[in-house]
Design a protein with these regions (language model features):
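Transmembrane alpha-helix segments characteristic
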Residues: 193-202, 219, 239-243, 303-324, ...
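Active-site lumenal/periplasmic loops and adjacent helix-entry segments of GT-C-fold
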Residues: 1-175, 210-214, 403-407, 434
């Protein structure tokens, strides 16, 4: 994480790692704009005038530090590092209360965070087609054993592809795992007094991570039904938990989430998640590997409590195989991976039982060898993915510091951002290209007319009219600049390599008709005032 968030390079540019090259830009824009523009509810700086329905609390916590004077990098990293520790600690405590102290809980933790499928086989293929080996993994862009879409590998590593780049998932899991811990103790171990604090924690989830709130709700519903069927008692406190959570969550859902999710692209039917190349069974065998193959015997040998707890995860998985909850089909993994965490717990419990039986049986001498092969198959894909993610950013190598990260902001654009921060109004609106790594939107907290469609589309936002307007502004300014400047409140217009790469920019018109307030090489910033 430390080498993935706008790392200053020796040439003055800012670098990122592979997984943060995309999403980080949007999150930094939200962090900086909440602090600089100080409006509530906050608006998208990538689409001015549109309230943010996305769970923004994961970013507003960093905005607090930025407002207090910390740098943008420090403000983004400090809460994220703390949240990451909470995720790991919360997951371990969940597995510990479920599986008991010892090897099973630790194994479950590693299976979840480092485990992977058989994707490594594509890189060590001995056939004529061959494989690129470790060099391809460590140097390719998203060609890892857990994220190789050309081969149908989508079972990403939770650390590299979810916790590091996806701040909402990171902060959501920081609350979700403690909630699951409390739920297990309250609903299965009958520590019913814990339903009340669980309701408060659960009710705080929607504006942190809506997917985590939904996942917790499904698992809780299954346990509630089981409680009713078994007539175990405690139904009143279980219902109190639900009422508290619903009362706290309702304003968040009604005022933010549901408004943005009203688009038809959010909720729709779809079978088999992202699989478009393989049969259902083979897709999960190669993506999840031994963890998937061991599930049937693990379920058969599991304790009643383990089967009951996993039942909610199984229902959640089934729902995710049938329903898509957001425009991006891939993002269903934010729900599926909650089921996967419970699957890892169930599998670890079974593997611990098998290990004990082998050590005490006739195969005790072969047990270490069998364990080594099993653990290698479980952890090789995830381990190689984490190695790739580390070297994809600027990092400490054997020969010293290596600047191998992806340039997300050039030195020229960084200087522009410094000028804008110091010399323009906080509520100024800029006409720029719609590149995702827009320095003004990322680093200054100012708004741009229209941001990257790769962000806005997956948030269910209608950005196409603004995108079309920008083309007219840059290519036919004599006819359209004044009209759209008034329509969208444009204060400044930028001409740089990004704009030239997007449109046939009429630079002669801008140079003759507008006041250039800042220039740096081939970059020029014009004022429309």
């Amino acid at each position: 994480m430390l080498n993935h968030v706008i790392v200053p390079a020796s040439d003055g540019s800012l670098h990122s790692g592979q997984s943060t090259y995309g999403d980080m830009c949007m999150h930094l824009g939200i962090i900086s704009s909440i602090s600089v523009q100080q409006s509530f509810p906050p608006e998208y700086s990538l689409l001015p005038g549109t309230a943010i329905g996305y769970p923004f609390l994961c970013d507003s916590v960093s905005s607090t530090f930025y407002t207090l004077g910390a740098g943008l990098r420090f403000s983004a990293l400090l809460p994220a590092m703390y949240a990451y520790l909470l995720v790991v600690a919360g997951a371990y405590l969940l597995f510990e209360v479920w599986l008991g102290r010892g090897g099973a809980a630790t194994l479950a933790l590693y299976l979840f965070f480092v485990g992977g499928g058989f994707g490594f086989a594509y890189f060590f293929d001995l056939s004529e087609a061959g494989g690129g080996g470790i060099s391809q993994i460590l140097s390719g862009f998203y060609t890892t054993p857990t994220n190789y879409t050309d081969k149908g590998i989508y079972w990403v590593n939770p650390i590299a592809d979810m916790l590091v780049p996806q701040r909402a998932t990171l902060f959501g899991w920081a609350l979700l795992f403690p909630c699951l811990h409390l739920l297990y103790r309250a609903a299965i171990l009958d520590e019913r007094r814990l339903f009340l604090p669980l309701g408060v924690l659960a009710g705080s989830l929607p504006l942190v991570h809506t997917h985590s709130f939904l996942a917790l709700g499904v698992i809780s519903l299954v346990l509630l039904i089981a409680n009713c069927l078994s007539l175990r008692g405690g139904l009143r406190l279980f219902l109190c938990y639900g009422l508290i959570a619903a009362a706290l969550a309702a304003p968040q859902l009604l005022c933010f989430t549901f408004k943005q999710a009203a688009s038809g692209s959010f909720l729709r039917l779809h079978w088999n998640w992202v699989n478009d190349k393989d049969s259902w069974l083979w897709f999960y065998v190669k993506n999840m590997g031994l963890i998937f193959l061991l599930m049937p015997p693990a379920l058969a040998c599991a304790r009643r409590e383990s089967r009951l707890f996993f039942a909610g995860g199984a229902l959640l998985w089934l729902i995710c195989e049938l329903v898509v909850f957001q425009p991006n089909l891939y993002d269903n993994n934010k729900l599926i991976f909650v089921s996967y965490a419970l699957m890892c717990g169930l599998t670890a419990e079974f593997m611990a039982k098998v290990w004990t039986a082998l050590r005490e049986g006739a195969l005790r001498r072969a047990a270490p060898v069998l364990a080594a092969f099993t653990l290698t198959a479980c952890f090789l894909s995830g381990g190689l993915t984490l190695a790739r993610e580390y070297v994809s950013g600027d990092h400490l190598g054997l020969g010293g510091w290596v600047e191998s990260g992806y340039q997300v902001v050039s030195a020229q654009q960084r200087r522009l951002a410094e000028y804008v921060s110091e010399n323009t109004e906080p509520d100024a609106v800029f006409a720029t290209a719609t590149n995702h790594n827009n320095a003004i939107a990322m680093l200054t907290g100012r708004s741009i007319v229209c941001g990257a469609g790769t962000f806005l589309y997956y948030h269910g936002l209608d950005y196409q009219p603004r995108e079309a307007a920008l083309k007219l502004v840059y290519e036919q300014p004599a006819e359209w600049l004044d009209f759209y400047a008034q329509e969208y409140g444009i204060d400044y217009l930028l001409v740089s390599s990004h704009e030239r790469g997007s449109w046939a920019v009429d630079e002669e018109y801008f140079a003759a008709e507008l006041d250039c307030v800042y220039s740096d090489g081939d970059l020029a910033l014009y004022s429309l005032k």
